[in-house]
Amino acid sequence: MSRNQQLFDRAQQTIPGGVNSPVRAFRSVGGTPRFITRAEGAYMWDADGQRYIDYIGSWGPMIVGHAHPDVVRAVQETATQSFSFGAPTEAEIDMAEEICKLVPSIEQVRLVSSGTEATMSALRLARGFTGRDLIIKFEGCYHGHADSLLVKAGSGLLTFADTTQNAPSSAGVPADVTRHTMVLEYNNVTQLEEAFARHKGEIAAVIVEPVAGNMNLVRASEAFLTAMRNLCSEHGSVLIFDEVMTGFRVALGGAQAHYGIKPDMTCLGKVIGGGMPAAAFGGRRDIMAKLAPLGGVYQAGTLSGNPLAVAAGLTTLRLIQAPGFYDRLATQTRKLADGLTKAAREAGVPFCADAIGGMFGIYFTNEVPGSFAEVTKADVGRFNRFFHAMLAEGVYLAPSAFEAGFVSAKHDDAIIEATVAAAAKAFKAG
């Protein structure tokens, strides 16, 4: 029995499903999860000593690669001063100033510990600011596991849930909780216009992933985001970009910089923690002024602005500002997508890929999807076989057909070429 299997059997005795986040259990693809012991650069090693090229990157944070010496040094130095204070620090100010500098739509920012906290708090703040209750979200967009957002959500919920009904995607969420959440089709401008026409003066906020990364990778059209911006401005609703995944990943200023569209509020996570638990939400000063202790919208957190997380995140944010960083990252990610597409074509496999910044999506379909409905038409069985063939070749992809992949600054030409060569074998194997 492999060491991975031994650990999985042991884990299931004390941890539900043997994992602390559902997608890690390999339930979608089958087989035994890999228990990781260490990682460096673009590689990680499992409990059986197998090395993998890593295209998960901790689901996005590891943009500069695993165990970057500057990040490690910053965390080590901070740890000697204590792990947490429960009081303000100068480093928190440095972090806030860096975020506001890099994302101009954010005039003020509040640090939290997870993406779910960021989106949940942003929506509460939007409701408090507008005095309205109704929220619009989109099919397949995952905004964390707050009850009001678990309706036709992406990420692990897309893998496990029945998404055919406009009902909570998770057991334990009362329908009453989600009745103030309206779910529309991603990239459907007409639906969005109709929703605002029917609910004038009722919509507190629209929350969207400007590049969806939790139903695989699906880009928002420029027309869709522009209509969203215009409608929110016209009706006094708060436009929230959930950039937990895309922030500092699609571009230095996030997806909003890529599209040139300015939201009222932004949620950040993943990259801003450099691998540590950290997230943030921020935006217009007049909206943020409603947040406690200034205003009546409450939000708090014992470990918000944790010194170790801030040290890792701030160091990462400074590293990614190096000249040419994003040009190189986008080039490598595009090389990967194009190489995989070429290998599939040569093997006669229906397949396509897309890439934006340091994110990519692979689809066992003939065309890149533009909506939740199109994503669900992908050949999941074929993806599962491909996943295991790649794993056997030492390439670690997301263990679900409905998750985006991530490239780091450490994925050089040799690593991309090795990945494409492994894929060529996997495609030919069927």
Curated annotation (Swiss-Prot):
Keywords for the protein's UniProt record, in alphabetical order: Cytoplasm, Isomerase, Porphyrin biosynthesis, Pyridoxal phosphate
The organism's place on the tree of life at top rank: Bacteria
Identification of the protein by name: Glutamate-1-semialdehyde 2,1-aminomutase
Pfam families cross-referenced by the UniProt entry: Aminotran_3 (PF00202)
Statement: the UniProt record of this protein carries the keyword Disulfide bond: no
Pathway membership: Porphyrin-containing compound metabolism; protoporphyrin-IX biosynthesis; 5-aminolevulinate from L-glutamyl-tRNA(Glu): step 2/2
Main location: cytoplasm
